[in-house]
Design a protein with these regions (language model features):
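Regulatory modules associated with amino-acid/nitrogen control
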Residues: 1-99, 125-143
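A generic structural motif
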Residues: 53-58, 113-119
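A cross-kingdom feature marking solvent-exposed beta-strand/loop segments within repeated
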Residues: 101-116, 122, 140-143
Length: 143
């Protein structure tokens, strides 16, 4: 999550007027033994390696056959544009709106932006709640 102690020129209104873009994929979150079967050239493949585990978030169609655990049934959207590291509260605002309505999230951050995943059965509700809060919702072209 990008954070800082200074919001710069951004106001509360700017945070709520941001656009989120729906990613037209079903996602899975996996725990792996290794990354041997992962093709990182594919879009929307996120890996994380710690001293305790190796994780993968990717389109369900790309889940490797050899894995330790998996959670299917996720949909994702991203915050459109490149987020400056000095901006704070962007992810917090989204997570509060969804948490107040009982919608859990899984977040992946990249250098440019944040990707927010929710369970598929709550995804449209999440988009509606964010739209009602002033976020623009942009749908991606179909694959």
């Amino acid at each position: 999550m990008k954070s800082s102690t200074n919001m710069g020129n951004w106001s509360q209104k700017n945070i709520y007027s941001m656009t989120i873009k729906v990613i037209n994929e079903e996602f899975s979150i996996c725990k792996l033994k290794d990354y041997a079967q992962i093709d990182i050239r594919e879009p929307f493949v996120f890996t994380g390696s710690t001293d305790e585990e190796k994780s993968l978030v990717c389109p369900t169609r790309l889940v490797p056959s050899e894995l330790l655990e998996r959670s299917d049934g996720w949909k994702a959207f991203r915050i459109e544009g490149v987020l400056d590291f000095s901006l704070i509260g962007i992810l917090a605002k989204i997570s509060v709106i969804l948490a107040e309505n009982g919608i859990g999230i899984f977040v992946v951050s990249t250098f440019n932006t944040d990707y927010i995943l929710t369970q598929t059965d709550r995804f449209e509700e999440a988009l509606r709640l964010l739209s009602n809060a002033g976020y623009g919702v942009q749908y991606a072209n179909s694959r």
